[in-house]
């Protein structure tokens, strides 16, 4: 075991604070990574405050990890000390089920999440990236390009793959009209990725003041979704919609925008269920309502390579670890464009 430091929540009502804990020793197939940057995902906040009712304290959040390899186990073939490396939402899975065989580890019933998940190696809970180091099986470690700003790459490990995977699954590309609902951490990545894939991108937002920024990010059109007059011309015009909004809202407003055989995919996990959608709205145009969860390791690497090729990163605000509690409060107010990233060097000076 190796002693490390991090930031943890010890209850739903306490702020995160300095935490000393241990990582497992480096095994034959493991990679030890010095964490340079860790993105701040809204899932971190949900878990810390036990809004999904599954937190096991203490919680060390963080699943958007970019770092540098410190050491590798004897059987590791794809990495060496000094390499850049990334870790996303998963650190293990069963490796034998149909989902794992199809490189869809995120759907494995026995997958292990990067934090707040039972660790098969230690018997304890996993601890995430708000830390100076992490040890992960090589299969779940990703290659990071040195062509991109590392801090801005970190959110790709969650926000990037969470939006890339459904866009790829539903074959978004040239000639398609694609709607993106919401312009937050997920939405701004969805706009960039859909545009890079060649689609005509329509951004739907409740905030008129986001129009200029949405077009800067790559949206061809911006529609204020609470304005009925703006929404009417878009009825039955979209091939695919990626809905990134987690807050419960009326889904029928958006399914009505789909063409026959169109699909709307939900990305955001709501604290409360959405109102039930109109079945008729789906049946009479053979529309589909679907969901998608992050992405498998192979696809995550594909996404990282795609982003390096197209010079795509997240828009980030870099913060010291000491400001994480204030960052959570700002997230709740929507006061971030578009993702906080922790500079983990500040943990050493904390």
Segments from the language model and where they lie:
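C-terminal hydrophobic helical "lid"/dimerization subdomain
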Residues: 2-4, 297-350
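Helix-to-beta-strand junctions that scaffold the AdoMet/dcAdoMet cofactor pocket
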Residues: 258-259
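Rossmann-fold NAD(P)-binding glycine/threonine-rich loop
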Residues: 269-285, 297-303
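N-terminal Rossmann-fold NAD(P) dinucleotide-binding loop
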Residues: 187-188
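Glycine-centered, small-residue-biased loops immediately flanking beta-strands
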Residues: 262-263
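NAD(P)H dinucleotide-binding glycine-rich loop of Rossmann-like/cofactor-binding domains
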Residues: 94-181
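Adenosine-nucleotide cofactor-binding segment
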Residues: 174-183, 193-253
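Glycine-rich beta-strand-centered segment in the early N-terminal region that forms part
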Residues: 24-38, 51-101, 106, 145-148
């Amino acid at each position: 075991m190796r002693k490390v430091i991090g930031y943890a929540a010890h209850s739903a009502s306490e702020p995160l604070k300095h935490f000393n804990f241990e990582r497992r020793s480096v095994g034959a197939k493991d990679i030890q990574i010095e964490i340079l940057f860790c993105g701040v995902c809204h899932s971190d906040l949900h878990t810390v405050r036990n809004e999904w009712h599954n937190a096991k304290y203490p919680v060390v959040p963080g699943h958007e990890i970019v770092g540098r390899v410190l050491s590798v186990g004897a059987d590791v073939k794809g990495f060496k000390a000094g390499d850049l490396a990334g870790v996303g939402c998963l650190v293990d899975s069963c490796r034998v089920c149909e989902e794992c065989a199809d490189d869809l580890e995120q759907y494995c019933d026995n997958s292990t999440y990067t934090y707040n998940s039972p660790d098969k190696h230690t018997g304890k809970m996993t601890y995430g990236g708000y830390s100076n180091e992490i040890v992960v099986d090589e299969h779940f470690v990703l290659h990071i390009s040195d062509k991109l700003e590392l801090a801005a790459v970190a959110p790709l490990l969650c926000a990037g793959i969470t939006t890339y995977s459904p866009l790829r699954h539903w074959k978004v590309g040239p000639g398609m009209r694609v709607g993106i609902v919401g312009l937050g951490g997920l939405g701004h990545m969805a706009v960039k990725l859909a545009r890079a894939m060649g689609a005509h991108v329509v951004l739907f937002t409740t905030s008129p003041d986001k129009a200029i920024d949405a077009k800067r990010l790559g949206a061809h059109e911006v529609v204020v979704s609470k304005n009925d007059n703006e929404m009417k011309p878009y009825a039955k015009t979209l091939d695919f919609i990626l809905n990134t909004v987690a807050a419960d809202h009326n889904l029928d407003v958006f399914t009505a925008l789909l063409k026959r055989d169109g699909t709307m995919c939900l990305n955001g996990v709501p604290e409360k269920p959405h109102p039930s959608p109109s079945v008729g709205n789906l049946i009479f145009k053979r529309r589909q309502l679907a969901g998608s969860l992050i992405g498998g390791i192979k696809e995550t690497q594909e996404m990282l390579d795609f982003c390096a090729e197209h010079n795509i990163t997240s828009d980030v605000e870099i913060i010291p670890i000491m400001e994480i509690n204030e960052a959570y409060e700002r997230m709740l107010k929507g006061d971030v464009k578009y993702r906080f990233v922790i500079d983990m060097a500040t943990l050493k000076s904390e």
